[in-house]
Amino acid sequence: MRLLFFFSILYTASLCCQLKDFLPCVMQLSAQKVDFNMNPIEVIFNITTEAKLMHTCRTYSRILPCFDQKMVQCGKPSEKTQLERGKRLHSYLCAPFSLQRQKIFLRRSKCIQDVLAEPQSSVCNRNDTVFADKLQSCREMCTRPDCVSKIELSEVSTCTYINIGKKCTAEAAQFFAQMQQVLTNKEYPMQCQYDLRKKPESELKKGLPIESLVAQTTSSTTYVTVHPPALPSVIDGVVTRTSLPIMRRTDPNSKFKPRPTTSQSNGPVIKTVIVDERGAPMNQPTSTQKPKVVHKFLPNPYTTKNPNTLKNDIIRTTRTIIPVVDKHTYVPWNYKVDAVQVSTLTSALAPVKPTETVISSPPVAFNFKLPAEQTSTQPFRVEINWHDDEVKQEPTKAPGVFVSPWYLKTPSHIPPEIEFATPTPLISSPLEAVSPILSQLKSNSLNFTELGNQANNYFSAALSAFAETKKEMAHNDPWRTIIDAVAPTIHKFSPDVIPRIREEINRIQPHQQKN
């Protein structure tokens, strides 16, 4: 579309630039099948689709430098101005930021073209519009014959603008006006000179203010003329017309001369004076408002080297380790020594486990001697004889009732394999019985699977022998003592045996009570 506008420029510039100079540019337009015309508005409104608009914009973007080069070679200033107008119109419709304007153009171009095809006149209803005031101002300010033609053009343009707004919406009218302003770089539709600024109001009447007939206590304004002392026209050898101090000193002795402290005033000074009924000035009441106290920034509060711990801090606790005299020392799980349970074994082999009940006295220490390693893992029956001699049936108080060889009559007798004793807290090594196990742990030769099998065999044999006893047992049953003493060790090495022991005890005890 701008190519057509440029061809109109070429027609006017043919006196300086020949047509053959622009022939390469015209050939490029023909190759791209872009129409051209002397009227740029007609070229613009012949575009009806978005694809054609994009094609025209791309073609102009490539060909405009060709016209610029030719204008630099043989163009006049007026011709260059026409080319600049075409560039502005191209930017208005084809710039990357003109997408909204392109949409408006594609929607309203057909309606605008229909309005422009009609005959234009200067007669239309301009009431209630700003154009009426502007045209009236143009007529009042027009004092030359050439401004009359501009007024007539403005009348026609305003009617065109109003008709487009009525038939094609106000959006189309604003778009058409903006396009004309970009093309001519002037206001549209007004083309004449006008001035709508309000005239300044008449100056206020000078003189003293009118006072009321009834004098009352009020705040009146009085005009007081202050005449400052005459100032010398020459200060330090420099003529000045202002009251600003002169920074440069031309006279070396001028620093001893006093400086004027009163600024020069040409007009009267207005002061507000509070008067009473007689017209005498009254003293203004003093303000009781206290001045604001400005608190300067205080230093940071003093902080100690040991600040308070936060609520969420975790208080660390220390564990007192009992000095170990013997490396084989072991404290049973249910024995409390200084509220700390310590084990010489590693955590994986002998973990420290708390219990719900803690006894006050030390438990019964025991020495459990393991037999030689066995190759057979099958359970076997063991008959335990507490005496080396033959079993003698000793009569009891009841006739026909004899003492069982498996029942320990005197507590002073100590079996050869299992020894019972009540140790004191001062015993140096309460775990002498497990010294072989500790030695095997250090040498990494202990087989826990075989040890568990041996423990199962021993307890199976013990329970079998214990089940054959049908006599009533005393309250201090030695088998119960054995089980209580050996249970922690069995629980540590073979925990699966404990439920079996409990089942056997529960099965045997009711049977003993019946007998």
UniProtKB/Swiss-Prot annotation:
It comes from the Eukaryota. Disruption phenotype: Resistant to infection by the microsporidian pathogen N.parisii and displays a fitness advantage phenotype, whereby there is increased fitness following infection by N.parisii. Fewer invading N.parisii spores following infection at the L1 larval stage of development due to impaired orientation, location and angle of N.parisii spore proteins relative to the host's intestinal apical membrane. Does not affect the ability of N.parisii to invade intestinal cells or N.parisii spore consumption by intestinal cells of L1 stage larvae. Induction: Up-regulated following infection by the microsporidian pathogen N.parisii or the bacterial pathogen P.aeruginosa. Expressed in the terminal bulb of the pharynx and the posterior of the intestine (at protein level). Expressed by intestinal cells and secreted into the intestinal lumen (at protein level). Residues 248-267 are annotated as: Disordered. One of its GO terms (cellular component) is extracellular space. It is found in: Secreted. Residues 1-16 form the signal peptide. Glycans are attached at residues 46, 127, 447. Keywords: Glycoprotein, Secreted, Signal. One of its GO terms (biological process) is regulation of entry of bacterium into host cell. Plays a role in promoting resistance to bacterial pathogens such as P.aeruginosa by inhibiting bacterial intestinal colonization. This is Protein aaim-1. It comes from Caenorhabditis elegans. The gene is aaim-1.
